[in-house]
Structures are given as structure tokens and as C-alpha cells.
Amino acid sequence: MKRTFILMLDSFGVGAATDADKFGDVGSDTFGHIAQACADGKADIGRQGPLKLPNLARFGLGHAGFESTGKFAAGFADNVEVIGAYGHADELSSGKDTPSGHWEMAGVPVLYEWGYFSDLTNSFPKELTDKILERAGLDGFLGNCHASGTQILEELGEEHMKTGKPIFYTSADSVFQIACHEESFGVENLYNLCKIAREELEPYNIGRVIARPFVGTGPADFARTGNRHDYAVLPPAPTVLDKLKDAGGEVVSIGKISDIYAHSGITQQFKATGLEELFDETLAQIKRAGDNTIVFTNFVDFDSHYGHRRDTAGYAKALEYFDSRLPELLAILQPEDLVIFTADHGCDPTWVGTEHTRERVPVLAYGAGLSAGSLGRRKSFADIGQSIASYFKLEPMNYGESFIN
């Protein structure tokens, strides 16, 4: 019975990519810098001491970090008995965004340039926002700038609730984000507004429209909820998910995976919010999974709650929680199963700003007859998709080199 389980630690990079200089990210290292902060006693909020990831270390995380950066992360060493195949991958895609990373790991790199709203203020063309407002029956909007999601709620959340005007904002990624209060504006109204924006953004080649619902009564308690929804464009070619689905297999999405692939190649989707729920649902779906099945989970909190917010201690605590659940995963695996731990980009919580970092990602693979040891540096995330295609004996992808015979 052939089954593949992809646990995608959103933003968990393992050192600056070969082309990091093009992005201003030379020296970034999400894993290494978190480990160093922990070792230095600078990440003791809610946790204490060195970064403890014994199970990921057994899958080869420390060794992957060493091969990527030339040194072991603080607290990790060569004295661990590694049970998995480990490597690290550079990104071929033009951007360091979520869709690019996900699509590339499924065998379809983004080799064109996304559209961006690069102006920090007055970010959106008036022609665009006028069309969105007219179609939605709204008389105005707030924001129109680059901002972090938490910051803009503190600044504009109350005005939004008083006026009913949605908050439009963007970032260094190819995104158009809309924040609205779940009660005063309504979640369905927000989703409908995002669908309108998605249609009007087609000429601008923007990767995603993101609905950012929030709750609360004021800046002190405004909080984004788990009802986020991403409206992505379709990948430019069939991914390995599409190929397995077309071959009669099952592709189970947990978390925001389905949104990122614009629901293409997905046969079942399950919503879950927070690391605990996401891991619980992953285990539940693995127990249910039959032959020719992919279960694919995005653990978004690493990125959204800790990476972008530059919360090093929070990121470390979340990693340690994730690691603590891995024995439960190992206990339910079957001999032919293939498990892959990876990431879609970096988001170094010690780095300047609030954006993603251009980093290599870990490629930790276990099962399916793979020998423990190094997979080396992979030239593209697409090696993951190609390996999955090889594992399921699907038609090869156009990009990537399989590490599975």
C-alpha cells in the first residue's frame, strides 16, 4: 500500500539560499538563528534553554542544517543516530512566497515574475479599487499600504468597525489582503468581497487574495481568526497532486493546502486551526488513508504567528510542540509509507522587517525503503514532487530529480 504524508512546516528555512543576495537575505537562517537564540537564553518566554527537537534531529534536521550552512545549529551535533534521508533544497522559483514554494515542491516551479504592489503607501491603483468598491456596493476603504496584519488592525480596526469600510493592504509578497471584522462586517461578506477582488486582479498577475477576518472590541484585543481564506490563481501546469488525482488516487488537504493550489488536484479537504488541531487532523487522516493517497498538511502557525511577527521564543516553543507529537506519527506508519518534512520558504524571526526570507528548505524523507543518510543539496524544491511521482509510478514531472529509485 503506497501512501505519502507531507508535513509542511511553513517558513522553516535552514539557511540562506544560493541566490539570497538578490533578495537582501544573505545570512538569514530561520532554524539556525532560533537555535542560537535559545542557546543564548534569548528565547525563554514560555519555554527555556536550548532548542530541543530530538525527533526531528533523528529524521536528520541537524544534519540538513549543517550541510546547508556549514555548521551545526546550536544544540545539534553529529552524534545523533539518524533514521531518515536528509537534504536541503534551493528554490528555482522567482519569488519567496507561499504559492511559489508549494507549487514548486509539487513539481511546478514559478519561472515568471509575479505582479507586486511595490509602493509602501497608496499601494493600489485607483482604477482597481474603484472597480472593487463599485461591484461590492461599498463607498470606501481603509489602508492602501504595506503593513503587518496585526499592526494594521491596531491602527485601523476601530475605524473599520465604525465606518464599515474594509481594510485593504499588501506586503512584499504578491498579495492583496482584506481585513474585516467577523461580526460587524460579516465573514461571508468578506469572502464575497475577496472573490470580486480576485476577478478584478486578473490583469495584475497577483498570486493571492487573502481574507483576513478578525474579532475583538478594540486594539487591545483584536485578533485574527481561523476563518482566513486564500484565493489563489491556478498553478501554471498540473502538479503531482493533479497527476495522482487523475490516476484515481486520493489527495487529502489539511489546513490551507487546498487554497494554495486553488483546489486543483485535491479530492478531500479538512479545516483545522492551530498546531494542535492541525496535528490531530493529520493523524486522523493518516489512520483513514488507503492506497494511493497523499495527506498534505500546512502548519501555518510557524509563519503567520511567529515568523512574520518576529517572535523567536514563540517559534521555538511551537517547534518543540510539533516535535513532541512525532512519536505519535511514527507509531501509526506502515512499512511502505513515505513521510516528508519540508518548508516553502524561510521567515527568520531574528531578521530585519516582517517578510519572508529567501532560504533553502529542509528535505527530510523517511520510509519507502529509503536509506538513512544524506540526499545532499537539491537544486529545486521540485525534487520532492518528482520523488513523489516516482514513488507512485506516475508520469514524470517536467522539473526535479527524484531521490527515490
UniProtKB/Swiss-Prot annotation:
Q: Which CDD domains match?
A: PPM
Reactions catalysed, as given in the entry = 2-deoxy-alpha-D-ribose 1-phosphate = 2-deoxy-D-ribose 5-phosphate; alpha-D-ribose 1-phosphate = D-ribose 5-phosphate
Q: Name one Pfam family in it.
A: Metalloenzyme
Residue positions binding Mn(2+) 1:
D10, D344, H345
What Enzyme Commission number(s) does the record list for this chain? 5.4.2.7
The primary location reported for this protein is: cytoplasm
| One Gene Ontology molecular-function label | magnesium ion binding
Q: Does the keyword Manganese apply?
A: yes
Task: State the needed cofactors, names only.
Answer: Mn(2+)
NCBIfam families cross-referenced by the UniProt entry: deoB, PRK05362.1
Which HAMAP family does the record match to this protein?
A: Phosphopentomut (MF_00740)
Function in brief: Isomerase that catalyzes the conversion of deoxy-ribose 1-phosphate (dRib-1-P) and ribose 1-phosphate (Rib-1-P) to deoxy-ribose 5-phosphate (dRib-5-P) and ribose 5-phosphate (Rib-5-P), respectively.
Q: Which family does it belong to?
A: Belongs to the phosphopentomutase family.
Q: What is this protein called?
A: Phosphopentomutase
Source species of the chain:
Shewanella frigidimarina (strain NCIMB 400)
